[in-house]
């Protein structure tokens, strides 16, 4: 399993974000509000979704894989593509997959849109402290996609605080990364917010009686330099994706592809949800409330 620990220079990132933070309370005033959703085109045949991101899209668990399995369990046809490179921002993900990306972006579909949905996840350093670059990267990639998918619905991935919930500045950086994601949504046509950060924050704060500590260990995220979603977090994210895109609660499969652990010899494989997830119902409710 690919578990290279990604070094973001996190101290410098947080220091920069701290210096650029506003003191306004407006950052978190819309935390509990339901965000507007983009309008997806009417697809002929199976719709197609593209995931663009780095290790928060796929590391210990895979958002594209879990979303595909949840769609299948709900008899929801879906073709899934992904452009994923660990530890880099959107423009570098594009550069890393340029040939594949250009080939796919040039494809057409009989309904007029090759892609129906696109999920865009920016790197934590950029999403947290470089709003201008964040907006420019999203504009660059959406402009390319819209050439043959003019009506595609875009979802901006709201990142998580890079700090542990126990850190005194966790909430400050949660607010900052959320504020920037909302700013990107506001400048991106036909886009909405995929509220991963909000959902994870709710789970940490015990919504629906969820308890993130299991045997005194964080059951949502794990990492040394970067905190990545574990099975509980991946389950939450998968349910959130379905609820956000289709505006309904998913029927969750009894088995999902989840991680066997966090060691170098661990991997992803199909597992019993009842055994691998600490509180599925609570996580499903948290996901639905953040759609």
Please give the residue ranges for each predicted region:
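Bacterial signal peptide processing site
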Residues: 19-21
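Conserved catalytic region of serine esterases and O-acyltransferases that act on ester linkages
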Residues: 220-228, 232-291
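C-terminal motif of bacterial Sec signal peptides marking the signal peptidase cleavage site
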Residues: 14-17
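Short hydrophobic segments within beta-strands
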Residues: 52-53, 157
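Conserved SGNH/GDSL esterase-like catalytic core that processes O-acyl groups on lipids
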Residues: 48, 52, 58-136
């Amino acid at each position: 399993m690919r578990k290279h620990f990604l070094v973001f220079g996190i101290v410098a990132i947080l220091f920069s974000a701290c210096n650029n933070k506003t003191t306004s309370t407006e950052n978190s005033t819309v935390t509990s509000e339901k965000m507007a959703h983009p309008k997806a085109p009417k697809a002929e045949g199976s719709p197609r979704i593209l995931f663009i991101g780095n290790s928060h899209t796929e590391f210990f668990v895979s958002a594209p894989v879990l979303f595909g399995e949840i769609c299948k369990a709900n008899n929801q046809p879906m073709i899934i593509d992904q452009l994923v490179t660990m530890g880099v921002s959107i423009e570098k993900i594009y550069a890393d997959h340029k040939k594949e990306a250009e080939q796919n972006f040039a494809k057409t579909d009989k309904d007029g849109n090759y892609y129906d949905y696109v999920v865009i996840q920016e790197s934590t350093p950029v999403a947290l402290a470089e709003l201008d670059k964040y907006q420019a990267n999203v504009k660059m990639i959406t402009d390319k996609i819209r050439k043959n998918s003019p009506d595609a619905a875009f979802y901006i991935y709201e990142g998580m605080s890079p700090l542990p919930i126990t850190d005194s500045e966790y909430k400050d950086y949660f607010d900052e990364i959320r504020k920037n994601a909302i700013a990107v949504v506001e400048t991106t046509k036909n886009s909405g917010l995929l509220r991963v950060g909000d959902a994870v924050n709710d789970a940490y704060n015990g919504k629906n009686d969820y308890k993130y500590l299991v045997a005194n260990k964080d059951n949502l995220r794990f990492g040394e330099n970067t905190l990545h979603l574990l099975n509980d977090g991946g389950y939450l994210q998968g349910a959130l994706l379905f609820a956000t895109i289709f505006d309904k609660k998913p029927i969750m499969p009894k088995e999902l592809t989840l991680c066997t652990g966090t060691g170098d010899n661990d991997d992803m494989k199909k597992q019993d949800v009842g055994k691998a997830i600490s509180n599925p119902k609570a996580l499903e409710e948290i996901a639905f409330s953040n759609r």
